[in-house]
Amino acid sequence: VPLKHQDHYDVVIIGAGLAGLSLARQLLLASDRLTILQIDKRGQIPPVGQKVGEATVQCSGYYFSKVLELEEYLLREHYLKYNLRFYWKTAGQDNSRFESYSQSYIRGMSNVPTYQLDRNKIEEELLRRNLETNQYTFDLNAINLKIDLAQADDQPHRVSYSVRGETHAVTARWVIDAAGRAHVLQKQQNLERKNAIKHGASFMWVDGLLNIEYLTDSTNREVRLNPQRSHTGHLPFWLATNHFCEEGLWWWTIPLQGKTSLGLVYDAKLIPPATVNDPDLLVKWVCEHFPCFARDLPKRRVLHWACYRDFSFDCAQTIDRRRWALIGEAGRWTDPLYSPGGDLISIYCTLVTDAILTADQAELDAKVELYEQLQKAVYGAYVPSYAVSYDCLGDQEAYTLKYVWELTIYFGFYVFPLINDLFTDRRFVVSFLQRFSRLGRVNVSLQTFLSRYFHWKKEHREPHTEPIFFDFYEIGGLGVAEKTFYKIGVSVDEAREVLDQQLANAMELARFTAAHIYAAVLGDPAVLRNRSFIESLDLERLTFDEQAMRLHYAEHAASMEPYPWKWNPEAAWRFVTPRKTPSAVAAAMTAGV
Protein backbone atom coordinates (compact mmCIF):
# COMPACT_ATOMS: atom_id res chain seq x y z
CA VAL A 1 0.00 0.00 0.00
CA PRO A 2 1.47 3.41 -0.87
CA LEU A 3 2.82 5.17 2.20
CA LYS A 4 1.45 8.52 1.13
CA HIS A 5 -2.03 9.38 -0.11
CA GLN A 6 -2.57 11.69 -3.06
CA ASP A 7 -4.80 14.73 -2.95
CA HIS A 8 -6.60 13.79 -6.17
CA TYR A 9 -7.57 10.49 -7.82
CA ASP A 10 -9.13 9.68 -11.13
CA VAL A 11 -11.47 7.20 -9.43
CA VAL A 12 -12.57 6.67 -5.84
CA ILE A 13 -14.32 3.35 -5.22
CA ILE A 14 -16.38 3.01 -2.04
CA GLY A 15 -16.42 -0.62 -0.93
CA ALA A 16 -14.12 -3.56 -1.58
CA GLY A 17 -16.38 -6.52 -2.25
CA LEU A 18 -16.43 -8.52 -5.45
CA ALA A 19 -17.92 -5.70 -7.55
CA GLY A 20 -15.57 -2.97 -6.34
CA LEU A 21 -12.42 -5.08 -6.50
CA SER A 22 -13.36 -6.34 -9.97
CA LEU A 23 -13.92 -2.81 -11.26
CA ALA A 24 -10.57 -1.71 -9.86
CA ARG A 25 -8.81 -4.59 -11.61
CA GLN A 26 -10.61 -3.96 -14.89
CA LEU A 27 -9.59 -0.29 -14.79
CA LEU A 28 -5.99 -1.12 -13.92
CA LEU A 29 -5.79 -3.58 -16.81
CA ALA A 30 -7.34 -1.03 -19.18
CA SER A 31 -5.06 1.90 -18.31
CA ASP A 32 -1.61 2.35 -16.79
CA ARG A 33 -2.36 6.00 -16.03
CA LEU A 34 -5.55 5.96 -13.96
CA THR A 35 -5.10 6.52 -10.25
CA ILE A 36 -7.54 4.70 -7.99
CA LEU A 37 -8.38 5.01 -4.31
CA GLN A 38 -10.47 2.21 -2.85
CA ILE A 39 -11.80 2.35 0.71
CA ASP A 40 -13.82 0.01 2.89
CA LYS A 41 -15.26 0.47 6.36
CA ARG A 42 -14.43 -3.10 7.37
CA GLY A 43 -11.25 -4.01 9.19
CA GLN A 44 -10.54 -7.15 7.18
CA ILE A 45 -10.76 -7.89 3.46
CA PRO A 46 -12.05 -10.42 2.76
CA PRO A 47 -14.23 -11.04 5.83
CA VAL A 48 -14.38 -14.42 7.53
CA GLY A 49 -18.02 -15.34 6.89
CA GLN A 50 -19.94 -16.62 3.90
CA LYS A 51 -21.16 -14.48 1.02
CA VAL A 52 -23.76 -15.48 -1.53
CA GLY A 53 -22.84 -15.27 -5.19
CA GLU A 54 -20.50 -18.26 -5.22
CA ALA A 55 -21.68 -19.70 -8.54
CA THR A 56 -20.94 -18.12 -11.91
CA VAL A 57 -22.66 -18.63 -15.23
CA GLN A 58 -21.34 -17.88 -18.71
CA CYS A 59 -21.13 -14.06 -18.59
CA SER A 60 -19.48 -13.90 -15.19
CA GLY A 61 -17.32 -16.97 -15.86
CA TYR A 62 -15.99 -15.32 -19.01
CA TYR A 63 -15.56 -11.96 -17.29
CA PHE A 64 -13.57 -13.23 -14.32
CA SER A 65 -11.43 -15.65 -16.32
CA LYS A 66 -10.83 -13.80 -19.59
CA VAL A 67 -11.49 -10.09 -19.01
CA LEU A 68 -9.91 -9.94 -15.55
CA GLU A 69 -7.24 -12.47 -16.61
CA LEU A 70 -7.83 -14.88 -13.71
CA GLU A 71 -8.30 -18.09 -15.70
CA GLU A 72 -5.29 -20.04 -14.43
CA TYR A 73 -5.95 -18.92 -10.86
CA LEU A 74 -9.60 -19.98 -11.06
CA LEU A 75 -8.73 -23.42 -12.41
CA ARG A 76 -6.08 -23.87 -9.73
CA GLU A 77 -7.87 -22.54 -6.64
CA HIS A 78 -11.59 -22.99 -7.38
CA TYR A 79 -13.83 -25.60 -8.99
CA LEU A 80 -14.84 -25.70 -12.63
CA LYS A 81 -18.64 -25.74 -12.57
CA TYR A 82 -20.81 -28.40 -14.18
CA ASN A 83 -23.79 -26.26 -15.25
CA LEU A 84 -27.06 -25.95 -13.30
CA ARG A 85 -29.01 -29.10 -12.43
CA PHE A 86 -32.56 -29.29 -11.07
CA TYR A 87 -34.33 -32.01 -9.04
CA TRP A 88 -37.92 -32.80 -8.07
CA LYS A 89 -39.42 -35.34 -5.71
CA THR A 90 -41.41 -38.24 -7.17
CA ALA A 91 -45.02 -38.80 -6.08
CA GLY A 92 -45.67 -41.98 -4.14
CA GLN A 93 -42.04 -42.39 -3.04
CA ASP A 94 -40.44 -41.42 0.26
CA ASN A 95 -37.68 -39.56 -1.65
CA SER A 96 -35.07 -40.56 0.92
CA ARG A 97 -32.77 -41.75 -1.89
CA PHE A 98 -31.20 -39.44 -4.46
CA GLU A 99 -32.17 -41.71 -7.35
CA SER A 100 -35.86 -41.16 -6.53
CA TYR A 101 -35.68 -37.59 -7.84
CA SER A 102 -36.50 -36.45 -11.37
CA GLN A 103 -33.77 -34.40 -13.03
CA SER A 104 -33.51 -31.69 -15.68
CA TYR A 105 -30.02 -30.66 -16.78
CA ILE A 106 -27.53 -30.08 -19.59
CA ARG A 107 -25.41 -33.21 -19.84
CA GLY A 108 -22.26 -31.72 -21.39
CA MET A 109 -19.94 -29.02 -20.04
CA SER A 110 -20.30 -25.46 -21.30
CA ASN A 111 -17.76 -24.29 -23.89
CA VAL A 112 -17.81 -20.92 -22.12
CA PRO A 113 -16.50 -22.20 -18.78
CA THR A 114 -18.15 -21.36 -15.49
CA TYR A 115 -16.81 -21.69 -11.95
CA GLN A 116 -17.77 -22.29 -8.33
CA LEU A 117 -16.13 -19.46 -6.40
CA ASP A 118 -15.09 -19.14 -2.81
CA ARG A 119 -15.91 -15.45 -2.62
CA ASN A 120 -13.42 -14.76 0.13
CA LYS A 121 -10.55 -16.33 -1.78
CA ILE A 122 -11.22 -14.55 -5.06
CA GLU A 123 -11.66 -11.19 -3.33
CA GLU A 124 -8.36 -11.72 -1.54
CA GLU A 125 -6.68 -12.49 -4.87
CA LEU A 126 -8.19 -9.47 -6.59
CA LEU A 127 -6.98 -7.21 -3.80
CA ARG A 128 -3.50 -8.75 -3.94
CA ARG A 129 -3.23 -8.14 -7.66
CA ASN A 130 -4.57 -4.60 -7.43
CA LEU A 131 -2.01 -3.77 -4.76
CA GLU A 132 0.81 -4.82 -7.08
CA THR A 133 0.37 -1.58 -9.06
CA ASN A 134 1.52 1.84 -7.88
CA GLN A 135 -1.63 3.43 -9.32
CA TYR A 136 -3.76 1.87 -6.59
CA THR A 137 -4.27 3.02 -2.99
CA PHE A 138 -6.33 1.02 -0.51
CA ASP A 139 -7.64 1.88 2.96
CA LEU A 140 -9.39 -0.36 5.50
CA ASN A 141 -11.32 0.88 8.55
CA ALA A 142 -12.60 3.89 6.60
CA ILE A 143 -15.38 5.51 8.63
CA ASN A 144 -17.10 8.91 8.85
CA LEU A 145 -17.48 8.88 5.09
CA LYS A 146 -18.70 12.05 3.40
CA ILE A 147 -19.23 12.42 -0.35
CA ASP A 148 -19.89 15.80 -1.96
CA LEU A 149 -20.78 15.16 -5.58
CA ALA A 150 -19.79 17.81 -8.10
CA GLN A 151 -22.57 19.96 -9.48
CA ALA A 152 -20.71 21.06 -12.62
CA ASP A 153 -18.85 19.17 -15.34
CA ASP A 154 -15.54 20.88 -14.66
CA GLN A 155 -15.60 20.32 -10.90
CA PRO A 156 -14.23 17.29 -9.03
CA HIS A 157 -16.10 15.30 -6.42
CA ARG A 158 -14.93 15.61 -2.82
CA VAL A 159 -14.57 12.59 -0.54
CA SER A 160 -13.51 12.59 3.09
CA TYR A 161 -13.18 9.77 5.62
CA SER A 162 -11.14 8.84 8.66
CA VAL A 163 -8.92 5.86 9.44
CA ARG A 164 -7.99 5.29 13.08
CA GLY A 165 -8.52 8.93 13.93
CA GLU A 166 -6.70 10.35 10.91
CA THR A 167 -8.85 12.27 8.44
CA HIS A 168 -8.29 12.00 4.70
CA ALA A 169 -9.81 14.41 2.21
CA VAL A 170 -9.41 13.89 -1.53
CA THR A 171 -10.93 14.99 -4.80
CA ALA A 172 -11.87 12.63 -7.60
CA ARG A 173 -13.03 12.78 -11.18
CA TRP A 174 -15.26 9.69 -10.66
CA VAL A 175 -16.91 8.26 -7.55
CA ILE A 176 -18.19 4.69 -7.64
CA ASP A 177 -20.45 3.23 -4.96
CA ALA A 178 -19.60 -0.46 -4.57
CA ALA A 179 -20.47 -0.56 -0.86
CA GLY A 180 -23.19 -3.17 -1.24
CA ARG A 181 -26.39 -3.02 0.78
CA ALA A 182 -25.19 0.06 2.65
CA HIS A 183 -26.49 1.88 -0.48
CA VAL A 184 -24.36 4.95 0.15
CA LEU A 185 -25.22 6.88 -3.00
CA GLN A 186 -28.70 5.37 -3.34
CA LYS A 187 -29.65 6.93 -0.02
CA GLN A 188 -27.76 10.17 -0.56
CA GLN A 189 -29.34 10.71 -4.00
CA ASN A 190 -32.78 9.32 -3.06
CA LEU A 191 -32.52 6.53 -5.64
CA GLU A 192 -33.86 3.62 -3.59
CA ARG A 193 -36.68 1.70 -5.26
CA LYS A 194 -38.50 -1.52 -4.40
CA ASN A 195 -39.39 -4.21 -6.92
CA ALA A 196 -41.96 -7.00 -7.15
CA ILE A 197 -39.55 -9.75 -6.03
CA LYS A 198 -40.19 -10.70 -2.39
CA HIS A 199 -37.86 -13.60 -1.69
CA GLY A 200 -35.79 -14.47 1.35
CA ALA A 201 -32.68 -16.61 1.69
CA SER A 202 -31.12 -18.68 4.48
CA PHE A 203 -27.70 -20.14 3.75
CA MET A 204 -24.66 -21.77 5.35
CA TRP A 205 -21.30 -23.42 4.86
CA VAL A 206 -20.78 -26.96 6.15
CA ASP A 207 -17.49 -28.81 6.42
CA GLY A 208 -16.35 -31.16 3.67
CA LEU A 209 -17.97 -32.19 0.39
CA LEU A 210 -21.66 -33.07 0.49
CA ASN A 211 -21.88 -35.35 -2.55
CA ILE A 212 -25.55 -35.61 -3.50
CA GLU A 213 -25.03 -38.80 -5.54
CA TYR A 214 -24.30 -40.65 -2.30
CA LEU A 215 -27.47 -39.55 -0.52
CA THR A 216 -28.64 -43.15 -0.91
CA ASP A 217 -28.31 -46.61 0.58
CA SER A 218 -26.86 -47.92 -2.71
CA THR A 219 -23.27 -49.15 -2.74
CA ASN A 220 -20.51 -47.34 -4.60
CA ARG A 221 -20.72 -49.94 -7.36
CA GLU A 222 -24.48 -49.54 -7.65
CA VAL A 223 -24.10 -45.76 -7.88
CA ARG A 224 -21.47 -46.10 -10.61
CA LEU A 225 -23.47 -48.61 -12.64
CA ASN A 226 -26.91 -47.07 -12.14
CA PRO A 227 -28.81 -47.38 -15.47
CA GLN A 228 -29.93 -43.77 -14.99
CA ARG A 229 -26.44 -42.82 -16.23
CA SER A 230 -27.58 -43.68 -19.75
CA HIS A 231 -29.43 -40.36 -19.44
CA THR A 232 -27.26 -38.35 -17.07
CA GLY A 233 -23.71 -39.43 -17.95
CA HIS A 234 -20.65 -39.65 -15.72
CA LEU A 235 -19.58 -36.09 -14.93
CA PRO A 236 -19.67 -35.44 -11.17
CA PHE A 237 -23.04 -33.98 -10.22
CA TRP A 238 -21.52 -32.34 -7.16
CA LEU A 239 -19.61 -29.91 -9.42
CA ALA A 240 -22.92 -28.40 -10.55
CA THR A 241 -24.99 -25.79 -8.84
CA ASN A 242 -27.67 -28.25 -7.76
CA HIS A 243 -31.23 -27.06 -7.17
CA PHE A 244 -33.80 -29.13 -5.26
CA CYS A 245 -37.11 -27.54 -6.14
CA GLU A 246 -40.62 -27.04 -4.81
CA GLU A 247 -43.25 -24.45 -5.60
CA GLY A 248 -41.73 -21.01 -5.10
CA LEU A 249 -38.47 -22.25 -3.55
CA TRP A 250 -35.20 -24.04 -4.18
CA TRP A 251 -32.36 -25.47 -2.10
CA TRP A 252 -28.84 -25.16 -3.49
CA THR A 253 -25.67 -27.20 -3.06
CA ILE A 254 -22.42 -25.64 -4.30
CA PRO A 255 -18.97 -27.24 -3.78
CA LEU A 256 -16.09 -25.12 -2.50
CA GLN A 257 -12.60 -26.23 -1.56
CA GLY A 258 -12.93 -28.02 1.81
CA LYS A 259 -16.58 -27.11 2.36
CA THR A 260 -20.03 -27.06 0.79
CA SER A 261 -22.28 -24.05 0.39
CA LEU A 262 -25.96 -24.76 1.04
CA GLY A 263 -28.89 -22.39 0.90
CA LEU A 264 -32.64 -22.02 0.65
CA VAL A 265 -34.25 -19.28 -1.43
CA TYR A 266 -37.98 -18.92 -0.99
CA ASP A 267 -41.04 -16.86 -1.79
CA ALA A 268 -41.83 -15.13 1.50
CA LYS A 269 -45.56 -15.63 0.87
CA LEU A 270 -45.05 -19.41 1.09
CA ILE A 271 -42.51 -19.81 3.91
CA PRO A 272 -42.46 -17.69 7.08
CA PRO A 273 -38.83 -16.59 7.54
CA ALA A 274 -39.00 -17.57 11.22
CA THR A 275 -39.18 -21.25 10.22
CA VAL A 276 -35.71 -21.22 8.60
CA ASN A 277 -33.91 -18.34 10.28
CA ASP A 278 -31.22 -20.27 12.13
CA PRO A 279 -29.03 -23.22 11.06
CA ASP A 280 -30.84 -25.82 13.18
CA LEU A 281 -34.24 -24.80 11.84
CA LEU A 282 -32.86 -24.72 8.30
CA VAL A 283 -31.42 -28.24 8.56
CA LYS A 284 -34.68 -29.52 10.04
CA TRP A 285 -36.74 -27.90 7.27
CA VAL A 286 -34.54 -29.27 4.48
CA CYS A 287 -34.49 -32.81 5.85
CA GLU A 288 -38.29 -32.78 6.02
CA HIS A 289 -38.83 -31.36 2.53
CA PHE A 290 -35.98 -33.16 0.74
CA PRO A 291 -35.59 -36.34 2.83
CA CYS A 292 -32.46 -37.59 1.07
CA PHE A 293 -30.48 -34.89 2.92
CA ALA A 294 -31.41 -36.45 6.27
CA ARG A 295 -28.78 -39.10 5.49
CA ASP A 296 -25.93 -36.60 5.68
CA LEU A 297 -26.71 -33.01 6.59
CA PRO A 298 -27.42 -33.40 10.35
CA LYS A 299 -23.92 -34.89 10.77
CA ARG A 300 -22.15 -31.90 9.25
CA ARG A 301 -20.48 -29.12 11.20
CA VAL A 302 -21.91 -25.71 10.31
CA LEU A 303 -19.05 -23.30 9.63
CA HIS A 304 -21.11 -20.17 9.05
CA TRP A 305 -24.74 -19.19 8.58
CA ALA A 306 -26.53 -16.02 7.44
CA CYS A 307 -29.85 -14.92 5.97
CA TYR A 308 -31.63 -12.22 3.99
CA ARG A 309 -35.29 -11.46 4.56
CA ASP A 310 -35.52 -9.56 1.27
CA PHE A 311 -32.92 -10.38 -1.33
CA SER A 312 -33.71 -8.18 -4.31
CA PHE A 313 -34.18 -4.45 -4.93
CA ASP A 314 -34.28 -1.86 -7.69
CA CYS A 315 -32.64 1.53 -8.12
CA ALA A 316 -33.79 4.63 -9.98
CA GLN A 317 -30.42 5.32 -11.62
CA THR A 318 -26.99 3.67 -11.62
CA ILE A 319 -24.77 5.91 -13.77
CA ASP A 320 -24.71 9.67 -14.28
CA ARG A 321 -23.13 12.12 -16.72
CA ARG A 322 -21.58 13.92 -13.75
CA ARG A 323 -19.28 10.96 -13.25
CA TRP A 324 -20.71 8.79 -10.53
CA ALA A 325 -22.02 5.24 -10.72
CA LEU A 326 -23.35 2.35 -8.63
CA ILE A 327 -22.27 -1.26 -9.19
CA GLY A 328 -23.05 -4.62 -7.59
CA GLU A 329 -25.45 -4.65 -4.67
CA ALA A 330 -25.07 -0.89 -4.35
CA GLY A 331 -27.35 -0.55 -7.39
CA ARG A 332 -29.92 -2.94 -8.85
CA TRP A 333 -29.96 -6.52 -7.59
CA THR A 334 -31.98 -9.58 -8.53
CA ASP A 335 -32.90 -12.96 -7.09
CA PRO A 336 -30.05 -15.55 -6.89
CA LEU A 337 -31.80 -18.13 -9.10
CA TYR A 338 -29.55 -18.66 -12.18
CA SER A 339 -26.68 -16.87 -10.39
CA PRO A 340 -27.19 -13.52 -12.19
CA GLY A 341 -25.32 -11.40 -9.63
CA GLY A 342 -21.92 -12.01 -11.18
CA ASP A 343 -23.40 -11.25 -14.60
CA LEU A 344 -24.73 -7.89 -13.43
CA ILE A 345 -21.30 -7.13 -11.98
CA SER A 346 -19.66 -8.16 -15.27
CA ILE A 347 -21.91 -6.04 -17.48
CA TYR A 348 -22.11 -3.01 -15.18
CA CYS A 349 -18.35 -2.91 -14.50
CA THR A 350 -17.67 -3.13 -18.23
CA LEU A 351 -20.01 -0.20 -18.95
CA VAL A 352 -18.62 1.87 -16.07
CA THR A 353 -15.03 1.15 -17.14
CA ASP A 354 -15.79 2.38 -20.65
CA ALA A 355 -17.47 5.51 -19.28
CA ILE A 356 -14.50 6.29 -17.02
CA LEU A 357 -12.12 5.94 -19.97
CA THR A 358 -14.19 8.40 -22.05
CA ALA A 359 -12.60 11.85 -21.90
CA ASP A 360 -14.93 13.84 -24.17
CA GLN A 361 -17.95 15.13 -22.24
CA ALA A 362 -20.35 15.08 -25.19
CA GLU A 363 -19.44 11.49 -25.94
CA LEU A 364 -19.76 10.61 -22.25
CA ASP A 365 -23.23 12.19 -22.12
CA ALA A 366 -24.39 10.02 -25.01
CA LYS A 367 -22.87 6.87 -23.55
CA VAL A 368 -24.27 7.40 -20.07
CA GLU A 369 -27.81 7.86 -21.36
CA LEU A 370 -27.57 4.69 -23.44
CA TYR A 371 -25.81 2.66 -20.75
CA GLU A 372 -28.51 3.52 -18.21
CA GLN A 373 -31.15 2.29 -20.65
CA LEU A 374 -29.15 -0.89 -21.20
CA GLN A 375 -28.71 -1.55 -17.49
CA LYS A 376 -32.43 -1.06 -16.86
CA ALA A 377 -33.30 -3.42 -19.71
CA VAL A 378 -30.85 -6.13 -18.65
CA TYR A 379 -32.08 -5.98 -15.06
CA GLY A 380 -35.76 -5.57 -15.92
CA ALA A 381 -35.81 -8.72 -18.05
CA TYR A 382 -35.10 -10.79 -14.93
CA VAL A 383 -38.04 -9.46 -12.93
CA PRO A 384 -40.90 -11.47 -14.53
CA SER A 385 -38.82 -14.64 -14.14
CA TYR A 386 -38.77 -14.11 -10.39
CA ALA A 387 -41.93 -12.15 -9.65
CA VAL A 388 -44.40 -13.88 -12.00
CA SER A 389 -43.47 -17.53 -12.59
CA TYR A 390 -41.33 -18.51 -9.58
CA ASP A 391 -44.10 -20.95 -8.64
CA CYS A 392 -43.15 -23.06 -11.69
CA LEU A 393 -40.21 -24.36 -9.65
CA GLY A 394 -42.77 -26.77 -8.22
CA ASP A 395 -43.20 -28.79 -11.43
CA GLN A 396 -40.54 -30.29 -13.68
CA GLU A 397 -42.44 -29.74 -16.91
CA ALA A 398 -43.49 -26.13 -16.28
CA TYR A 399 -40.05 -25.24 -14.99
CA THR A 400 -38.22 -26.95 -17.86
CA LEU A 401 -40.25 -24.94 -20.37
CA LYS A 402 -39.55 -21.78 -18.39
CA TYR A 403 -35.82 -22.39 -18.05
CA VAL A 404 -35.24 -23.34 -21.69
CA TRP A 405 -36.95 -20.09 -22.72
CA GLU A 406 -34.89 -18.01 -20.30
CA LEU A 407 -31.60 -19.75 -21.09
CA THR A 408 -32.16 -19.32 -24.82
CA ILE A 409 -32.54 -15.57 -24.35
CA TYR A 410 -29.55 -15.53 -22.02
CA PHE A 411 -27.23 -17.25 -24.51
CA GLY A 412 -28.25 -15.08 -27.45
CA PHE A 413 -28.80 -11.70 -25.81
CA TYR A 414 -26.47 -11.70 -22.78
CA VAL A 415 -23.57 -14.06 -23.44
CA PHE A 416 -23.09 -13.34 -27.15
CA PRO A 417 -22.74 -9.54 -26.76
CA LEU A 418 -20.55 -9.80 -23.67
CA ILE A 419 -17.97 -12.22 -25.12
CA ASN A 420 -17.74 -9.97 -28.20
CA ASP A 421 -17.26 -6.68 -26.27
CA LEU A 422 -20.41 -5.36 -27.94
CA PHE A 423 -22.13 -3.81 -24.93
CA THR A 424 -19.78 -0.81 -25.17
CA ASP A 425 -20.44 -0.21 -28.87
CA ARG A 426 -23.22 2.37 -29.10
CA ARG A 427 -24.20 1.31 -32.61
CA PHE A 428 -24.80 -2.22 -31.36
CA VAL A 429 -26.57 -1.19 -28.16
CA VAL A 430 -29.21 0.80 -30.05
CA SER A 431 -29.94 -2.24 -32.23
CA PHE A 432 -29.88 -4.51 -29.19
CA LEU A 433 -32.43 -2.45 -27.26
CA GLN A 434 -34.82 -2.34 -30.21
CA ARG A 435 -34.86 -6.13 -30.48
CA PHE A 436 -34.74 -6.78 -26.75
CA SER A 437 -37.87 -4.70 -26.17
CA ARG A 438 -39.82 -7.01 -28.50
CA LEU A 439 -38.68 -9.98 -26.44
CA GLY A 440 -39.71 -8.21 -23.25
CA ARG A 441 -43.37 -8.05 -24.19
CA VAL A 442 -43.43 -11.73 -25.11
CA ASN A 443 -41.53 -12.62 -21.95
CA VAL A 444 -44.13 -11.07 -19.63
CA SER A 445 -46.94 -12.79 -21.52
CA LEU A 446 -45.24 -16.18 -21.53
CA GLN A 447 -44.18 -16.08 -17.87
CA THR A 448 -47.79 -15.44 -16.86
CA PHE A 449 -49.00 -18.23 -19.15
CA LEU A 450 -46.49 -20.67 -17.62
CA SER A 451 -47.54 -19.78 -14.07
CA ARG A 452 -51.22 -20.29 -14.88
CA TYR A 453 -50.42 -23.63 -16.51
CA PHE A 454 -48.53 -24.74 -13.40
CA HIS A 455 -51.53 -24.08 -11.18
CA TRP A 456 -53.95 -25.69 -13.65
CA LYS A 457 -51.76 -28.78 -13.84
CA LYS A 458 -51.68 -29.18 -10.05
CA GLU A 459 -55.45 -29.54 -10.09
CA HIS A 460 -56.04 -31.45 -13.31
CA ARG A 461 -53.09 -33.75 -14.07
CA GLU A 462 -51.83 -36.84 -12.28
CA PRO A 463 -48.27 -36.55 -10.92
CA HIS A 464 -45.44 -38.72 -12.21
CA THR A 465 -44.73 -41.82 -10.12
CA GLU A 466 -41.30 -42.54 -11.66
CA PRO A 467 -38.35 -40.16 -12.13
CA ILE A 468 -38.01 -38.37 -15.47
CA PHE A 469 -34.62 -37.38 -16.89
CA PHE A 470 -34.57 -34.47 -19.32
CA ASP A 471 -31.69 -32.70 -21.06
CA PHE A 472 -32.67 -29.09 -21.74
CA TYR A 473 -31.06 -29.35 -25.20
CA GLU A 474 -33.80 -31.79 -26.22
CA ILE A 475 -35.83 -28.65 -26.96
CA GLY A 476 -33.99 -27.53 -30.07
CA GLY A 477 -34.19 -23.77 -29.75
CA LEU A 478 -31.65 -23.80 -26.93
CA GLY A 479 -29.02 -25.43 -29.13
CA VAL A 480 -29.53 -22.72 -31.75
CA ALA A 481 -28.77 -20.07 -29.13
CA GLU A 482 -25.72 -21.95 -27.84
CA LYS A 483 -24.14 -21.72 -31.30
CA THR A 484 -23.61 -17.99 -30.68
CA PHE A 485 -20.74 -18.98 -28.36
CA TYR A 486 -18.75 -19.62 -31.54
CA LYS A 487 -19.57 -16.34 -33.30
CA ILE A 488 -16.59 -14.30 -32.14
CA GLY A 489 -14.92 -11.17 -33.49
CA VAL A 490 -18.01 -10.13 -35.43
CA SER A 491 -18.62 -6.69 -36.87
CA VAL A 492 -21.58 -4.62 -35.73
CA ASP A 493 -23.47 -5.48 -38.91
CA GLU A 494 -22.75 -9.17 -38.39
CA ALA A 495 -23.82 -8.86 -34.75
CA ARG A 496 -27.14 -7.37 -35.83
CA GLU A 497 -27.68 -10.36 -38.11
CA VAL A 498 -26.98 -12.69 -35.18
CA LEU A 499 -29.47 -10.78 -33.03
CA ASP A 500 -32.10 -11.06 -35.76
CA GLN A 501 -31.50 -14.81 -35.98
CA GLN A 502 -31.71 -15.15 -32.21
CA LEU A 503 -34.85 -13.04 -32.02
CA ALA A 504 -36.50 -15.29 -34.61
CA ASN A 505 -35.31 -18.36 -32.72
CA ALA A 506 -36.68 -17.03 -29.43
CA MET A 507 -40.05 -16.24 -31.02
CA GLU A 508 -40.18 -19.76 -32.44
CA LEU A 509 -39.42 -21.14 -28.99
CA ALA A 510 -42.15 -19.00 -27.43
CA ARG A 511 -44.56 -20.32 -30.06
CA PHE A 512 -43.50 -23.89 -29.24
CA THR A 513 -43.93 -23.31 -25.50
CA ALA A 514 -47.42 -21.89 -25.89
CA ALA A 515 -48.41 -24.65 -28.34
CA HIS A 516 -47.10 -27.34 -25.98
CA ILE A 517 -49.19 -25.95 -23.13
CA TYR A 518 -52.28 -25.85 -25.34
CA ALA A 519 -51.63 -29.45 -26.41
CA ALA A 520 -51.10 -30.58 -22.81
CA VAL A 521 -54.30 -28.91 -21.62
CA LEU A 522 -56.30 -30.35 -24.51
CA GLY A 523 -54.56 -33.72 -24.16
CA ASP A 524 -53.87 -33.86 -27.89
CA PRO A 525 -50.34 -33.87 -29.38
CA ALA A 526 -51.85 -33.12 -32.80
CA VAL A 527 -52.16 -29.52 -31.60
CA LEU A 528 -48.37 -29.28 -31.87
CA ARG A 529 -48.42 -29.79 -35.63
CA ASN A 530 -51.39 -27.67 -36.69
CA ARG A 531 -49.90 -24.79 -38.67
CA SER A 532 -53.07 -22.74 -38.86
CA PHE A 533 -53.49 -22.84 -35.09
CA ILE A 534 -49.83 -22.28 -34.23
CA GLU A 535 -49.56 -19.24 -36.48
CA SER A 536 -52.72 -17.81 -34.88
CA LEU A 537 -51.09 -17.55 -31.43
CA ASP A 538 -50.66 -13.97 -30.23
CA LEU A 539 -47.47 -14.33 -28.21
CA GLU A 540 -47.80 -10.92 -26.58
CA ARG A 541 -51.33 -11.61 -25.32
CA LEU A 542 -51.44 -15.23 -24.22
CA THR A 543 -54.41 -15.95 -21.96
CA PHE A 544 -54.81 -19.12 -19.93
CA ASP A 545 -58.46 -20.19 -19.82
CA GLU A 546 -59.16 -23.84 -20.59
CA GLN A 547 -62.54 -23.30 -22.22
CA ALA A 548 -61.31 -20.37 -24.31
CA MET A 549 -58.26 -22.39 -25.34
CA ARG A 550 -60.48 -25.26 -26.51
CA LEU A 551 -62.61 -22.88 -28.55
CA HIS A 552 -59.51 -21.23 -30.01
CA TYR A 553 -58.10 -24.55 -31.18
CA ALA A 554 -61.47 -25.74 -32.50
CA GLU A 555 -61.41 -22.88 -35.01
CA HIS A 556 -58.32 -24.45 -36.60
CA ALA A 557 -58.73 -28.16 -35.84
CA ALA A 558 -59.80 -29.07 -39.38
CA SER A 559 -56.58 -27.71 -40.89
CA MET A 560 -54.26 -30.47 -42.11
CA GLU A 561 -51.16 -28.43 -43.00
CA PRO A 562 -48.28 -29.25 -40.59
CA TYR A 563 -46.23 -26.51 -38.97
CA PRO A 564 -42.59 -26.57 -40.21
CA TRP A 565 -40.81 -26.92 -36.87
CA LYS A 566 -37.01 -26.94 -36.87
CA TRP A 567 -36.95 -29.37 -33.93
CA ASN A 568 -39.06 -32.18 -32.53
CA PRO A 569 -42.35 -30.59 -31.45
CA GLU A 570 -43.05 -33.49 -29.08
CA ALA A 571 -39.72 -33.10 -27.24
CA ALA A 572 -41.46 -32.37 -23.92
CA TRP A 573 -44.52 -34.57 -24.44
CA ARG A 574 -43.31 -37.25 -22.03
CA PHE A 575 -44.06 -34.84 -19.21
CA VAL A 576 -47.79 -34.96 -20.03
CA THR A 577 -49.76 -37.29 -17.75
CA PRO A 578 -53.42 -38.41 -17.73
CA ARG A 579 -56.06 -36.09 -16.33
CA LYS A 580 -57.21 -36.62 -12.78
CA THR A 581 -60.68 -38.02 -12.27
CA PRO A 582 -63.35 -35.48 -11.24
CA SER A 583 -63.25 -36.81 -7.67
CA ALA A 584 -59.46 -36.45 -7.55
CA VAL A 585 -59.72 -32.87 -8.84
CA ALA A 586 -62.28 -32.04 -6.16
CA ALA A 587 -60.10 -33.61 -3.48
CA ALA A 588 -57.04 -31.71 -4.68
CA MET A 589 -58.92 -28.40 -4.67
CA THR A 590 -60.24 -29.11 -1.17
CA ALA A 591 -56.73 -29.92 0.05
CA GLY A 592 -55.31 -26.83 -1.61
CA VAL A 593 -52.98 -28.91 -3.81
What are the roles of these predicted feature ranges?
Residues I106-R128, I271-N277:
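Short beta-strand to alpha-helix junction loop
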Residues T241, E247-L249, Q257, D267-Y390:
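FAD/FMN-dependent oxidoreductases across multiple families
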Residues I356-V593:
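C-terminal helical "tail/cap" subdomain of flavin- and related membrane-associated enzymes
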Residues L28-V52:
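Glycine-rich FAD pyrophosphate-binding loop
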Residues P46-N95:
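N-terminal FAD cofactor-binding segment of flavoenzymes
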Residues A19, Q44, A182:
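Conserved Rossmann-like nucleotide-cofactor binding loop
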Residues R129-P291, C349:
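Predominantly flavin-linked oxidoreductase catalytic cores and closely associated redox partners
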Residues L3-A19, L37:
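Beta1/beta-strand and adjacent pyrophosphate-binding region of the FAD-binding site
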